[in-house]
Design a protein with these regions (language model features):
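Conserved cytosolic headpiece of P-type ATPases
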Residues: 1-756, 761-764, 821, 838-911
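Glycine-rich phosphate-binding loop plus the immediately following alpha-helix
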Residues: 470, 474, 773, 777-778
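Generic alpha-helical transmembrane segments
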Residues: 734, 815-832
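Alpha-helical transmembrane segments and their membrane-interface junctions
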Residues: 778-793, 864-875
Length: 911
């Protein structure tokens, strides 16, 4: 690098002064709607409006009873109870949705923590984007999102996507004033926060941070995208609409039935009907019908889904999965194929030079020991290797910890710099002493990079250095004097690749003043092949087990890598994907893959396990071919060129150290890059779906029981079996409380033993439907039988039922109605545990990690007891105290719901 391009950057004191003067690099979020307004918005919900109308009707009835019938002030307890229930349900819903919104704000926080490479006090280091200050010197490269506004100091073939600010998709940036675009919105040497580097690399000096940037003036907070309608969300919308219509029909049926039964008492002789009493009865009927509709409509379903997503997103973040688009949570659970990169995902991405083979005029260096010796001498050959590695690179080392320097930038290039450093070669000094004339950045299509410099180690020489895939670099070389044949080099490469090593080839040529980099290629007629390095990148310890989990879960795993077939095959063997039974049909190279017709690809795609020497568009085509086979595809990517594949997949998985372009195109960011985290995301996705099924199972079972009981009560002509406030309490249990309890259930590793579900299969499957109808029908039959007994016999306590004598129809007493209400609640209380264990074949009492369920169930039980036994509360719910023996009978009897399920589970597990 030219000496005038050696930058020191800011000192620690200058950083502190700049931050104090210009502020931090964080954008102030736009003002949000005040909480009180958000709360009032809840009262615009149609169901809340219906409840408010019911409350007003209840007030009207109470006024009639108080004034017209001269009853006591206790008649107002029911309307008060209705309004308390409305505010309680609305308040809880508002609170938990607010908490969920806080979870969704995590995206902005993570964006501000993105790593940025800067030069400070002469050292290259990484800091969080929020810590960038005015005056900082920042390195930007392909795929980076520019962290602040700044002015370019050095730029190499830099193109920036400014479409987010100016609408220009590609702007060429340069420091050469002669090449400035006079028509550009901003000067060609100025780069802006939030825009993205699409090609090249550069150094910039920050001129504005935070709200002072151009982006800050038009800032809108990053949002987690919930706009995509998945098959599940469409199903839930349809289910909610269907249940709502059915509930309204039942509500109308209740109104008609109650009016008919009332008029039947007078043989439909309207002259004998007390008008005021009839109006009061009509109002009471309307109130019951509207409340029944409110209870039946699954308004808790959206909250259950929201809570499940929020809980899943928070816990997934702890397992290194940052959800960027909410639909991905659910879709990951239906994934049937995962297309994964190799480097960093299956391997540790901790690269080191393990072997080297250099060729010096017939004198071969075939070991790392020999290569180390070459670095220590001062021959031209040694200088070509040292200088070529140092200057033909975009990586740097961070010496913040001198004992263990870390790599900034490309890990493969970083391994070479670490090798130089370990042998006492100061790569920074070499960069500072040379003058860079031309550069050709690396691309996945080209598979090599080149740099032209005026040499410092060989004064007076202008050198072209090339580095890249060995077979590509070797083919570029014209001079083969003293160099082994292509076959010999290929044989050496194969030995390295069979040990899962990544190989790089090096070449150089002394040139004159002519331009050798033209239109993205090098034009050199005497390029000389220097040799090869073999870089080891060990497999992550946890990956073989995670691959096994995915295969056991019925998920196909495919490796898509730029490495050679031998390297990829060996990695596949180490992680348990490639076996002795696999053949050439299971592995294909990028060029061979590109040559396939769509028909040929469709016939082969499910058999392919590895694509070697793959290019980014190969990955996209693979995704599309799998989708044609009705597969649900998740794909990983970390580079800008991976964006098309990430967008095409059902779930795009970007890597934590990937480019900003890749992250923006993805649905989930794997923060630690590990395949194990991908496996965890699948487990969370499946568990999320299962939790929603559990909530639906519980809610619809309660719906069936409540609707049929109230309708049957109306047809029987009895007093309403459940009062409005009682139904609202039941609604609170099955909607809000059940959503809280079942949405927060921890994921079960057992879901990884199941095959992937059909993504378009209806969420209510046959076992669920059978249980909803069966259990709901049983509860309904039990309660109707009790209601019939209560209507035709005087029950003082439950033990009277065994010796009851059915007589004439009579009024159901408050004690009997309290028994009915409490039995309803307690049977469903115990059924909540059954719903938690649905489809697991595990005990319903296995509550490890279910803190939310334990808390909610305890709250329901204690509240029900207080509601029935506390005199100050009884009046709101039209209940009376129960005898201790009746409590014991109800609890023990209702618990049979649980024990029958436990017996069934025990018998099933013995099969």
């Amino acid at each position: 690098m030219n000496p005038q391009h050696h930058f020191i950057g800011l000192s620690d004191q200058q950083v502190a002064d700049s931050r104090a003067k210009y502020g931090i690099n964080v954008l102030t979020p736009p003002p949000t709607t005040p909480l009180w307004k958000q709360f009032l918005e809840k009262f615009r919900d149609p169901l809340i409006i219906i409840l408010l109308i019911a409350g007003v009707l209840s007030v009207a009835i109470s006024i009639y009873e108080y004034i017209g019938l001269q009853q006591g002030a206790e008649v107002f307890f029911e309307p008060v109870g209705i309004f308390v229930a409305i505010f309680l349900a609305t308040g809880l819903s508002f609170y938990f949705e607010t908490q969920a919104d806080k979870e969704f704000c995590v995206l902005n926080q993570v964006n501000d923590d993105e790593p940025v490479e800067v030069i400070r006090s002469g050292n290259h280091t990484q800091i969080a984007k929020r810590d960038v200050v005015v005056g900082d010197i920042v390195r930007i490269g392909i795929g980076c999102e520019i962290p602040a506004d700044g002015e370019l100091l050095v730029a190499t073939q830099l193109s920036v996507d400014e479409s987010t600010l100016t609408g220009e998709p590609l702007c060429h940036k340069t420091t050469d004033t002669a090449l400035f675009d006079s028509k550009a919105t901003y000067p060609s040497n100025r780069v802006l926060r939030g825009t993205k580097v699409m090609e090249g690399h550069a150094l910039m000096q920050v001129t504005a941070v935070g709200d002072a940037t151009e982006n800050g003036k038009v800032y809108k907070a990053a949002q987690i995208d919930n706009s995509v309608k998945t098959p599940l969300s469409e199903q839930l919308d349809w289910l909610g609409l269907w249940v709502s219509r059915l509930s309204c029909s039942i509500g109308v049926a209740v109104i008609v039935a109650r009016i008919v039964m009332y008029l039947a008492q007078y043989d439909f002789c309207f002259a004998e009907v007390d008008t005021l009493a009839f109006i009061a009865y009509i109002l009471q009927t309307l109130m019951i019908a509207m409340t029944l509709v409110v209870v039946s409509v699954p308004e808790g379903l959206p909250m259950a889904v929201t809570l499940s997503l929020a809980y899943s997103m928070r816990r997934m973040l702890k397992t290194n999965n940052l959800v960027r688009k909410m639909h991905a949570c659910e879709t990951m659970g239906a994934t049937t194929v995962i297309c994964t990169d190799k480097t960093g995902t299956l391997t540790q991405n901790r690269m080191s030079v393990e072997e080297a083979c250099f060729y010096r005029g017939g004198e071969d260096c075939k070991s790392i020991i020999d290569a180390n010796k070459i670095l220590l001498d001062s021959s031209d050959f040694s200088n070509e290797i040292k200088e070529g590695i140092a200057v033909n690179s975009t990586a740097s080392l961070d010496f913040s910890n001198p004992a263990a320097p870390s790599v900034l930038g490309n890990p493969t290039e970083g391994a070479l710099l670490l090798w130089l450093h370990a042998n006492g070669v100061d790569y920074e000094a070499l960069r500072e002493e040379v003058k860079v004339v031309e550069e050709l950045p690396f691309t996945t299509d080209r598979k090599y990079m080149a740099t032209v410099v005026e040499s410092a180690l060989m004064p007076g020489k202008r050198m072209l250095y090339v580095k890249g895939a060995p077979e590509i670099v070797y083919d570029l070389c014209a001079s083969t004097d003293g160099i082994p044949s292509k076959a010999a080099v290929d044989a050496q490469l194969k030995l390295y690749q069979q040990r899962a090593m990544r190989t790089l080839g090096f070449a150089c040529q002394e040139i004159g003043d002519e331009k050798v980099i033209v239109d993205g290629t090098i034009h050199a007629d005497k390029l000389r092949f220097l040799g090869i390095t073999a870089i080891a990148d060990p497999v992550r310890n946890e990956v073989p087990e995670s691959i096994g989990e995915c295969l056991n879960a019925g998920i196909c795993v495919k490796i898509v890598t730029g490495d050679t077939a031998e390297t990829a095959k060996e990695i596949g063997r180490q992680v348990g994907l490639w076996t002795d039974k696999d053949t050439d049909r299971n592995i294909i190279s990028g060029p061979e893959f590109a040559a396939l017709t769509d028909a040929q690809l469709d016939a082969l795609v499910m058999d392919i396990k590895i694509i070697a020497r793959a290019r980014p568009m190969d990955k996209k085509r693979l995704v599309e071919a799998l989708q044609r086979k009705n597969q649900v595809v998740a794909v990983t990517g970390d580079g800008t060129n991976d964006a098309p594949a990430l967008k095409a997949a059902h779930v795009g998985l970007s890597m934590g150290d990937g480019t900003s372009v890749a992250k923006e195109a993805s649905d989930i960011t794997i923060i630690d890059n590990s395949f194990k985290s991908i496996c965890k995301a699948v487990m969370w996705g499946r568990s999320l779906y299962q939790n929603i099924q559990r909530f639906l199972l519980f809610q619809l079972t309660v719906n069936v029981t409540a609707c049929m009981l109230v309708l049957c009560g109306a047809l029987m002509g009895t007093e309403a079996p459940l009062t409005v406030t009682q139904m609202l309490w039941i609604n609170l249990i099955m909607d809000t409380f059940a959503a809280m309890a079942l949405a927060s259930l921890p994921p079960s590793e057992a879901v990884m033993n199941d095959r992937p579900r059909d993504r378009r299969a209806f969420i209510i499957n046959r076992p669920m439907l059978a249980e909803i109808v069966g259990v709901g029908g049983f509860f309904f039959a039990l309660l109707v039988a009790l209601l019939y007994i209560f209507e035709h016999a005087d029950i003082q306590q439950l033990t009277d039922i065994v010796r009851v004598q059915i007589g004439e129809s009579s009024t159901v007493t408050p004690y009997e109605l309290t028994l009915l209400f409490t039995i309803f609640v307690m049977t469903h209380f115990f059924y909540l545990f059954n719903a938690r264990a649905f489809a697991t074949h595990r005990s319903a009492l296995h509550l490890k990690g279910c803190k939310g369920l334990i808390f909610i169930s305890t709250l329901i039980f204690v509240t029900q007891v207080c509601m029935v036994e506390l005199p100050g509360v009884q009046r709101f719910f039209n209940v009376v105290s129960l005898k201790p023996l009746d409590w014991l009978i109800i609890i023990v009897g209702s618990s049979f719901v649980l024990w029958i399920r436990e017996l069934w589970s025990l018998l099933w597990n013995k099969k």
